[in-house]
Amino acid sequence: MEDTQDTYSYDAPSIFNFSSFHEDHNADSWFDQVTNAENIPPDQRRLSETSVNTEQNSKVEPVQTTPSKDDVSNSATHVCDVKSQSKRSSRRMSKKHRQKLLVKMKDTHLEKETAPPEYPPCKKLKGSSSKGRHAPVIKSQSTSSHHSMTSPKPKAQLTMPSTPTVLKRRNVLVKAKNSEEQELEKMQELQKEMLENLKKNEHSMKVAITGAGQPVKTFIPVTKPVDFHFKTDDRLKRTANQPEGDGYKAVDFASELRKHPPSPVQVTKGGHTVPKPFNLSKGKRKHEEASDYVSTAEQVIAFYKRTPARYHLRSRQREMEGPSPVKMIKTKLTNPKTPLLQTKGRHRPVTCKSAAELEAEELEMINQYKFKAQELDTRILEGGPVLLKKPLVKEPTKAIGFDLEIEKRIQQREKKEEIEEETFTFHSRPCPSKMLTDVVGVPLKKLLPVTVPQSPAFALKNRVRIPAQEEKQEEMVPVIKATRMPHYGVPFKPKLVEQRQVDVCPFSFCDRDKERQLQKEKRLDELRKDEVPKFKAQPLPQFDNIRLPEKKVKMPTQQEPFDLEIEKRGASKLQRWQQQIQEELKQQKEMVVFKARPNTVVHQEPFVPKKENRSLTESLSGSIVQEGFELATAKRAKERQEFDKCLAETEAQKSLLEEEIRKRREEEEKEEISQLRQELVHKAKPIRKYRAVEVKASDVPLTVPRSPNFSDRFKC
């Protein structure tokens, strides 16, 4: 029963180092190893056991193998066969197998503790033609020569399942340093910084002593290769004593700004380029190990066997460590640098003009201004009145006759030849011979059809109605025309409706009324033709006295003289203009004539300054009696009191009004409540008394029955 049953067994380590308890971040990796060991098939386990025995006298060497196609196919089939086996064999293990497995796991634990730190493998060169994979081949010391003689090609081994390095997240364990070692390191760092500062100070002192010399070509420092430092490496957990990487230092941008030489004049220390070896092919990135193929069935079983992450206890390492240590900022010596004053090279634009410029501008303005003297008017010396020059009188506008359309029409009418009226002359015609033989103008009498006798249709029960044979009109059968078949090669394109914009046009009903009038006249003519015309002889005209109508002669339009408004306007404007000129001349003459005003100053009283009526005591002592005055604060206080009184009065009035409104509302509410109570109380109403119903007998006589006489046979 013990062999067949699947019991839970574990292998706890015999020795446990409590000092490295906080450093071991993969303490729970043992559970994953046990689950992986249980999932290994028996054939693979035997191979691993043999490899463990030969591990002591063996060396692992990376050999670049290029397996042939046959080997690859054989190995692939072998792996598939192994994985397709059932997993009951792994569950039903014997005691011997379990003991061997435990021994193997102990050995692996010891090897891991004593194993050196893993370094990343070298990158493959680009020029390497071999595409084979580096696989570690185990060679024993005793059988190495024999193996090389017998087997020219190494056999393909089964790849062991292992978690990739990315998922392991194992930190390189570094030995903890003592406090003395840490202090020594700090001392060395401080000494280095002091030496650097001394060198900088000496250099700055030399530059200050020498002063600004001739411009020298600036010395550009040689580019120094710095190793790459990825931020992803900092995400891994570090111990408290583990030093930070020296490849990359955090640089303060503000402090690095003034590191370049202040000016190209200063001489910098020259130096030869120091060649440093650098390998572009090497890198710190660890290559991910290619994971082996695992079938879905194995993945599902492993998932069910593995305990989920939510049931694992949280690591209390961070809680035990406490808060993160605060980094101390190291104080550095200040580097004295000479200020680069640029006052000499500064040029401000002068906006204010100097006195010389202002004087030059004034001279230019004076030279530009030229005085032009006008001719002397002799009338001023003569002493006569200075009159303005008369403006030139323009000729009045001459009226030009208009070409009116009425005159054109009159001329056209005169040109038309007078139409001579045709004189009526009577010509006798021969009498028709038909009038003597027959009646003329009377239509023939229409012959009515003979009446056909028919028996009377009495209303009898056995009467058989003869259906009237109605003449059936021949109905016009519509002709159906077949539409043409469409061509299948041409695609169907529907006819789009044209978007026509209807323009509103003026219309009238005159044409329609005319058409209706014509139709009406046609109908009347037809009716007249149907009527029998009566012959009425007209009397013969008298040919002795022929009276023609008098000829109406129209008188031509006679032209009359007419006055245009333009001529009147021109004459009135001239008159107004002359009047204005005369008035202006009068005003100018009056303005020129000098008229002296009367001297009123002589008759006025002279100005006498008033003396101050001060006493001698006031003038000597200097004491002056102050007049009464009123402060603005007192004035404002009075105004404030009045304002407060007005406010109090208005507030009192408001409060009175509010109380009155409140009382009214209360009274109205009381009245409404009382009315509601009265309405809610049910009061019984008395039964209404109506008049009694009196039944009266009808006075209408009874109907006398009579037989209906449907037929006319019994009538006399």
UniProtKB/Swiss-Prot annotation:
Keyword terms of this UniProt record: Cell cycle, Cell division, Cytoplasm, Cytoskeleton, Microtubule, Mitosis, Nucleus, Phosphoprotein
Keyword Aminoacyl-tRNA synthetase set for record: no
Comp. bias intervals (Low complexity): 140-151
Disordered: annotated segments: 35-167, 262-291
Compositional bias of kind Basic and acidic residues: 104-115
Keyword set includes Nucleus: yes
GO BP terms, alphabetized: cell division; regulation of mitotic spindle organization
Annotated Gene Ontology cellular component terms: cytoplasm; microtubule; nucleus; spindle pole
Top-level taxon: Eukaryota
The protein's role, per its UniProt record: Spindle assembly factor. Required for normal assembly of mitotic spindles. Mediates the binding kif15 and aurka to spindle microtubules. Required for targeting kif15 to microtubule minus ends. Activates aurka by promoting its autophosphorylation and protects the phosphorylated residue against dephosphorylation.
Subunit structure as annotated in this protein's UniProt entry: Associates with microtubules. Interacts with aurka and plk1. Interacts with kif15.
Official protein name in the record: Targeting protein for Xklp2-A
